[in-house]
Design a protein with these regions (language model features):
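Non-heme di-metal
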Residues: 1-190
């Protein structure tokens, strides 16, 4: 069944455009975070930007070519501080997972595109995770807790991998001397 001329086709293009724009905004936000001394947050913005690219690609691949006219609204041109950018990013992710994609999934389902509906629902789950991550980072920035915790944890240098144990990240890496901006909470993903 062709999606040409359907509401689902329009929703896919809106989603492609939204994800593509989010990717660009997140790369801009990463530059600000880096300048403000938040290498980890810059890394999170870049990682999320790449994930948004994959979402855009997934939506784009459902389209069947030609010109499609859409009417949509997107965030326009404000790059703020890292805290402001985290807040804006969290709000955008919230709108996607709680409003847009569930509605787009419903429409796709009604139009008989169950596979597309499932993709909208699954990407909505990812966007909820993005929002949660941005809100956690925002809370840490606002509380001055990016490089400090209430309990002893393991910190790791993003540059050389040195691991340090303490409540506060060292001001500079004891191994490679990179500044505190490169220190983050150690995560095991193996």
């Amino acid at each position: 069944m062709s999606i040409k001329g359907t509401k689902t086709e329009q929703n896919l293009l809106k989603s492609f455009a939204g994800e593509s724009q989010a990717r660009s905004r997140y790369t801009f936000f990463a530059s600000v975070a880096k300048k403000e001394g938040f290498e980890q947050i810059a890394g999170v913005f870049m990682e999320t930007a790449e994930q948004e690219k994959e979402h855009a690609k997934r939506f784009f691949k459902f389209l069947e070519g030609g010109m499609v006219e859409i009417t949509a609204s997107y965030p326009a041109g404000v790059i703020g501080t890292t805290a402001e950018n985290l807040k804006a990013a969290a709000e955008g992710e919230n709108e996607e997972w709680s409003d847009l994609y569930p509605e787009f999934a419903k429409v796709a389902e009604e139009e008989g595109f169950t596979a597309i509906a499932a993709v909208f629902r699954n990407i909505a789950k990812v966007e909820a995770e993005h929002e949660a991550r941005y809100r956690t980072l925002l809370a840490r920035v606002e509380a001055g807790k990016v490089f400090e915790r209430d309990e002893v944890i393991l910190w790791q240098c993003r540059n050389c991998g040195f691991v340090y144990e303490g409540k506060t990240a060292p001001k500079a890496c004891p191994a490679c001397a990179h500044p505190q901006a490169y220190i983050e909470e150690k995560k095991n993903n193996y």
